[in-house]
Structure formats: structure tokens, C-alpha cells
């Protein structure tokens, strides 16, 4: 799968570099670093950008990298349209977005753009300031509506139960369970073997308590 790695530029390069290494990029993948328009006039931002370019050229020589200036002073919606076209000009199967650095307005702009994109997995990664840990969120899952039946079936699948066993426990027909699984597969919550994906586990954890409260 071809990856498009995007990141927001701040005063330090360490967050971008650490995320790049974790992402496991290889030949055929691409990198876009979004920087505020006029970033070259700021010594810290320019130094961070130059360091990123130098390290990428050394450890990922076969990967195309681009620094795209983001106009934070212009029309917000028009800039979303422009940057979305920049992203869609690339060929990729998934997006990894490192949003650990940069101005809040820049991060908001990039998140807004990512929310308008459909058709491929998008993972947002944010690292703690002390570098002790990082958070990864499958953005697509946040756009999937809550469905109590989906939560139930996902929990059964996570425990290793078959369609027939789930049908027996829930008193829903095997055909209904299979249809629910097919629906969830369209949202990448389960794979072809009816195993939960990363998105599926995230969905269950995010809505499990909501489901339990509604049941009680």
C-alpha cells in the first residue's frame, strides 16, 4: 500500500522525524510537510524544515518530499479547497498525518481538510511534548455513526465467536449477522476473515460505554 505522510511544521523537527521513522515509509510513498506561508522568514521554522529535508534525503532517499506553504491569513475555506487538491494530486492508499507541531490554526486547517477526504484510511498521530508516548487515531472511525448492533457484533467477533454462535446468543438470524458484518466491512471495521481491524477495536472502545448505558 502506498502511503502519503503529511505533517505540520513547527519550531522543532523531532516530532516529524520520530513519526516518519514509526510510519515505515518505503519506495513509492510520499511526504508533504505543511508550513505556514512565509515560514522561511522565521529562523526556527526554516532550520526545522532544512533539518527534516536533510534527514529524509539521508534515510529515505527514494521518497519524494515536498514542503507546501499554507496561507493562514487568507480565506480559510478556499485554502482548504486548494490544499485538498494538492493532496489528491498524489497517488496513495492511506494517509498518516503527524500533527504534533506547528501553529494551532495550521493544525486546524489540516484536520479540516482530512475530514473532507473519503475512500482511504487516515491515521492522525500526535506525540506528547515529553516524548513519552503518542496517540494514534483512525480518523475515519470518528465519522462512522453509532450503531448498537455493530458494537454488539464486534464484541462477539473480538471474542472469536462465529456467525452462527453470534446468531444463537443474540437471537438474530445468521443472515442478519452476516449482513451486519458486510456493512461494517465497508467501513473497514472488520477484514475479509471477520477479524476486527485497528479501526474496529477503536470503534468498540469508543462506543462500548455508550452502549452499556443505553442498555441499563
For the regions a protein language model found, what residue spans apply to each?
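Short N-terminal targeting/anchoring amphipathic segment
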Residues: 93-101
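Long, low-complexity, Lys/Arg-enriched
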Residues: 1-94, 108-111, 115-216
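Polyanion-engaging groove/track-forming segments
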Residues: 104
Amino acid at each position: 500500500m502506498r502511503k502519503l505522510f503529511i505533517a505540520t511544521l513547527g519550531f522543532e523537527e523531532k516530532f516529524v522525524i520520530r513519526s516518519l521513522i514509526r510510519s515505515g515509509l518505503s519506495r513509492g510513498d510520499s511526504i508533504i510537510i505543511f508550513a505556514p506561508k512565509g515560514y522561511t522568514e522565521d529562523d526556527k521554522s526554516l532550520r526545522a524544515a532544512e533539518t527534516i529535508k536533510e534527514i529524509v534525503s539521508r534515510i529515505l532517499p527514494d521518497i519524494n518530499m515536498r514542503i507546501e506553504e499554507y496561507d493562514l491569513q487568507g480565506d480559510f475555506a478556499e485554502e482548504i479547497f486548494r490544499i485538498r487538491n494538492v493532496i489528491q494530486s498524489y497517488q496513495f492508499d492511506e494517509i498518516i498525518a503527524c500533527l504534533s507541531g506547528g501553529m494551532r490554526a495550521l493544525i486546524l486547517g489540516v484536520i479540516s481538510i482530512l475530514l473532507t477526504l473519503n475512500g482511504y484510511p487516515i491515521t492522525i498521530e500526535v506525540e506528547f511534548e515529553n516524548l513519552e508516548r503518542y496517540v494514534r487515531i483512525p480518523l475515519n472511525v470518528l465519522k462512522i455513526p453509532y450503531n448498537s448492533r455493530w458494537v454488539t457484533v464486534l464484541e462477539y467477533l473480538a471474542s472469536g465467536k462465529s456467525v452462527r454462535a453470534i446468531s444463537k446468543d443474540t437471537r438474530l438470524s445468521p443472515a442478519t449477522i452476516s449482513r451486519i458484518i458486510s456493512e461494517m466491512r465497508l467501513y473497514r471495521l472488520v477484514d475479509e476473515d471477520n477479524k476486527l481491524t485497528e479501526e474496529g477495536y477503536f470503534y468498540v472502545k469508543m462506543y462500548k460505554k455508550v452502549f452499556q448505558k443505553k442498555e441499563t
